[in-house]
Amino acid sequence: MIKNSFSAIFFKEENEDNKGSVEFQVVSFTNRIRKLTSHLELHKKDYLSQRGLRKILGKRQRLLAYLSKKNRVRYKELIGQLEIRETKKN
C-alpha cells in the first residue's frame, strides 16, 4: 500500500502552524477517507473500518457545512481542489 499517494498539494506552501484551520482538517479527513476506501475495496467485510469511515465522513460533512456558512468562496475553492461533491442542502 502506498502511504503518501494522497498528499495534499494545497497545503504544501503553508506553514504547519495552521493545522487547526477548517481547510487543513477537511484535507486530512479526505486523505483518510481515500485510504480507507481503497482498504475497503480489498477487505469488504471489515465492518469496523466501515464504521470508522462513516464517522470520518460525518465529521468532514459537518466541517464543510460550517465552512459553507462562514465563507462560501473558500468552500467552493476547497471542494474544487479536492474534487469532492458539494453537500446537499436540506
Swiss-Prot record:
Its main location: plastid. Keywords: Chloroplast, Plastid, Ribonucleoprotein, Ribosomal protein. One of its GO terms (cellular component) is ribosome. It is found in: Plastid, Chloroplast. Pfam families: Ribosomal_S15 (PF00312). SUPFAM superfamilies: S15/NS1 RNA-binding domain. Part of the 30S ribosomal subunit. Belongs to the universal ribosomal protein uS15 family. This is Small ribosomal subunit protein uS15c. It comes from Daucus carota (Wild carrot). The gene is rps15.
